[in-house]
Curated annotation (Swiss-Prot):
Alphabetized InterPro entries for the sequence: aa-tRNA-synth_II, aa-tRNA-synth_II/BPL/LPL, Anticodon-bd, Anticodon-bd_dom_sf, His-tRNA-ligase, HisRS-like_core, HisRS/HisZ
Enzyme class, first EC level, given as a word: ligase
Superkingdom: Bacteria
Entry-linked Pfam families: HGTP_anticodon (PF03129), tRNA-synt_His (PF13393)
Name under which the protein is recorded: Histidine--tRNA ligase
Record GO terms (molecular function): ATP binding; histidine-tRNA ligase activity
Subcellular location: Cytoplasm
Gene transcribed to yield this protein: hisS
PROSITE patterns: AA_TRNA_LIGASE_II
Taxon lineage: Bacteria, Bacillati, Actinomycetota, Actinomycetes, Micrococcales
Catalytic activity line of the entry: tRNA(His) + L-histidine + ATP = L-histidyl-tRNA(His) + AMP + diphosphate + H(+)
Length: 458
């Protein structure tokens, strides 16, 4: 991870690093499918109008154009396109907005509630830094309903993510949960109608601190010092159980939307507290910057690595996807896979047992044995044992060094006994043990069959 990318913000993994990423993706996929989520993939490009319908991300979007089109504009043969043309194509910056479009276009072919997972590259024109890249992989789960969606799914998706993250070698993590209705109802209850502006300011709390947020609330939202103090008092509430309800009510603010949000959040937190103890807290400072969230919102941090920011976030959206009078409310969470893997590698949180899939290297001492060596490898592969064959005869020592350099645990030798009959032996180059083996039935230990990714020893 100390290598410098030739193109800033676009990471390329070495084989051992890629194995760690693949382990993360495989673990997530397996967990998602155990919970009944179906995998899909959407196109890499959307129209600019589709991407910018919700949220303030226009400066982060990569627009797409044909090189020939740019040349025609430069030559004066056609007018340049309006940069803000809603029909212009651009790379998607997340998977939620494309998924909303996918649901609308395919609603007649989907069974609702529709449970989907999606793992793809996304692109954002951000300033590259630790934990932030311009091209990165996300892994999303969402449940979408037709017309309505039970609030129980808000807890369901969080439990799935808690299980998925708990299966990874990343140590402790914490899912921080809030509710937009609770926050917006509170702000309106204290007389602040620009709830979106308040949320944007509160969303900066961990980066700039309470004094700066108080200033932003007063200068940009028009809050009085007392209103700013009340908004910050709400954001200061954090509990591991439903006791946050009493603490909010103790602030003396009333509003119908506030009560609705309190009830929804209490139900989610109670379920998480019961089924995933120690994995989640109610944290009323969580705002989430995107405008399409309408209820429960989540952010997840690695304990001890909070400065990395959220590795998994999302929430409830009731109006992101619609078709005429038909509305498709949903709730989902997204893991920043690249961000997570970058931290796993840089902090040596997990390591791959080897950098290649090969378990057995079939050595050659005579070039005329190459075809027979291929037969040995074929027998091994038929039983699911990854094997490769030397392309030319060399001294055993050189071939063992080659296997060791690549991390291949076993070397297969073909020889002949005193009577000239073919004999086979396999050597564990880590321990030096060598014994007779039959290519038709020999199997390596289960832990050596494929590369293993495990939490590094402290």
């Amino acid at each position: 991870m100390s290598r410098k990318a030739s193109l800033s913000g676009f990471h390329e993994w070495l084989p051992a690093e890629r194995l760690v990423e693949q382990h993360v993706l495989d673990t997530l996929r397996r967990t998602f499918e155990l919970h009944g989520f179906a995998g899909i993939e959407t196109r890499a490009v959307e129209t600019l109008g589709q991407l910018l319908r919700k949220g303030e991300v226009d400066k982060e979007v990569y627009a797409v154009s044909r090189l020939a089109e740019d040349e025609e504009v430069a030559a004066g043969r056609r007018e340049p396109k309006d940069p803000a043309d809603p029909k212009r194509l651009a790379l998607h910056f997340d998977l939620t907005v494309p998924f909303a479009r996918y649901v609308v276009e395919n609603a007649g072919h989907l069974a609702f509630p529709f449970r989907r997972y999606q793992m793809q590259k996304v692109w954002r024109g951000e300033r590259p830094q630790e934990g932030r890249a311009r091209e990165f992989t996300q892994a999303d789960i969402d449940v979408v309903g037709d017309g309505a969606l039970s609030p129980r799914y808000d807890a369901d998706v969080a439990l799935v993510m808690a299980e998925a993250l708990g299966a990874l070698p990343i140590g402790d993590f914490l899912i921080r949960v809030n509710n937009r209705k609770l926050a917006e109802g509170f702000y309106r209850g204290i007389g602040l109608e620009d709830t979106a502006g308040v949320l944007r300011s509160i969303d900066k709390l961990e980066k700039v601190g309470p004094e700066e947020v108080a200033r932003l609330l007063q200068e940009e939202v028009g809050a009085s010092p007392e209103q700013a103090a009340q908004a910050l008092a709400l954001a200061d509430i954090r509990t591991s159980d439903t006791s946050f309800v009493e603490r909010v009510r103790a602030l003396g603010v009333t509003h119908e939307l506030l009560e609705e949000g309190l009830t929804e959040l209490a139900d989610v937190v109670a379920t998480l507290h019961r089924r995933a103890p120690g994995r989640a807290v109610a944290d009323l400072s969580i705002a989430r910057g995107l405008d399409y969230y309408t209820g429960t919102v989540y952010e997840t941090v690695l304990v001890g690595h909070e400065q990395l920011g959220s590795i998994c976030s999302g929430g409830r959206y009731d109006a992101l996807a619609s078709k005429g009078n038909r509305v498709f409310p949903g709730v989902g969470l997204s893991i920043g896979v690249t961000r997570l893997v970058m931290r796993m590698l840089s902090q040596q949180m997990a390591v791959a047992s080897r950098s290649v899939p090969t378990a057995v290297y079939v050595a050659l001492t005579a070039d005329e044995d190459w075809s027979e060596a291929q037969d040995v490898a074929a027998l091994l592969r038929e039983r699911g044992i990854p094997a490769e064959v030397a392309v030319s005869a060399e001294k055993f020592g050189r071939q063992i060094k080659y296997a060791d350099r690549r991390g291949i645990p076993f070397v297969w030798f073909m020889g002949r006994d005193d009577a000239g009959a073919r004999v086979h032996e396999v050597k564990d180059i880590r321990s030096g043990e060598q014994h007779a083996a039959d290519p038709a039935d020999w199997t390596p230990p289960a832990e050596d069959l494929l590369p293993q990714v495990a939490r590094a020893q402290d």
